[in-house]
Amino acid sequence: MASRERSPALRIGIISDTHGSLDPRAYAALADCDHIIHAGDICGPAILRELETLAPVTAVLGNNDFDEYGSAVGHFAHPVLEGVRFLVGHKPGDVRVSFAGSAALAPGDPLPDVIIHGHTHVPELKTGPDARPAGIYLCPGAVYRPRSEFGRTLAKMDVEAGRILRTWVENLDEKVLMEA
């Protein structure tokens, strides 16, 4: 993103599946972020400490994570950033919300604007009917052992005053691969 001028919006970096290894290029790519979301399979508290040197971090447990992070990291997170509601979980089946409900949301919880998951190691960006009931459904891919032709990826999102201005997935060479 170095070639585009940055807006004054809050920039969120979204990462998943580090598996105990934070690629230096991923760290550098997240340096312009005001908040970081990690969608699980962190695999070591050192990863979160390293990310926290850049920005505040919201993280969830993945299927390879254990109780080594304390109570601040659970199976789901529901941050509200600049008025935008997020639902973050590791496995896609756990965060796919239907009108019948989900383990990720309690009765009466507001529906999220953005649903984020990890686990698949494949980037995915859906909007419109494919993202329902959210406006954006996102998997940032993986920075460790990617499972797609895109290689190692992460996502970013600019939000401001309750609006999602831009969402994109980029590889670690900062080439934009998907955008909404």
Show where each model-derived region lies.
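Active-site metal-binding loops of divalent metal-dependent hydrolases
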Residues: S16-G20, G40-I42, N63-D65, K91-G93, ...
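A composition/secondary-structure signal for short, hydrophobic, low-basic-content segments
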Residues: I15, F86, I115-H117
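Short, solvent-exposed aromatic-acidic interface loops
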Residues: T167-E179
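Conserved beta-sheet core of the metallophosphoesterase superfamily
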Residues: T58, P92-W168
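Beta-strand-turn-beta hairpins that frame and shape the catalytic cleft
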Residues: S3-G13, H78-L87, P129-Y137, V159-W168
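N-terminal active-site segment of His-dependent metallophosphoesterases
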Residues: M1-V57, D65-F76, G83, F150-T153, ...
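Glycine/small-residue-rich loop that forms an oxyanion/phosphate-binding "nest" at active or ligand-binding sites
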Residues: L61-L111
